[in-house]
Amino acid sequence: VQNHHVAEIKGGTFNTTGSAQYVVDNEGHNGAANDLGQMTISGGTLNGKIYVVGAGASLAVTGGTFSDPSALLYLSGNANVKIRLNGDATCNGFKTQSGQSVELDLNNHVLTLAKPTVGSAGTETNSCQLLKGSTVTMKNGTLASDNDKIMIQNYCNLTLDAMTVRGLNALYVLSNNCGNILINN
């Protein structure tokens, strides 16, 4: 789905095949009436990379199932989102807000959280910050980061199921400040 104006995806299945690079290509370059790049995704299954470019582009993800973990960078409102990797992947640090629910199924792959890191203003030192009132499940794979501070800063109800959390340089791979953590293997 390439969008230069206004688009909303509420359902359906979208796959990249052949030479297609992106399942979502959302562009808003100059603020002109025909180049807004405003997109909302509230449902559907999207298998492929997400690409958002341009100073005016905005993407709000409130639902759906994605193979690209960068969907986590665009969580909005009371998002209820599933990520299921189809290969090893890298994405920037991400955060969840109160009311959001995320299921991250690594599907026996490695997800590497890269820079930039996230956190509260002035202390953006986390690979992921899971805020109070959100619910997050990570399962079936390896979460990795080269971050030298905190990989997972947790305030939510968090489940780690059949997970390896690898932060060779981290001060902490998991810091729990609020909420309950359930670790299963």
Task: Please state what every model-predicted region is.
Residues I83-V102, L106-T117, N147:
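N-terminal extracellular ligand-recognition/capping segment immediately after the signal peptide
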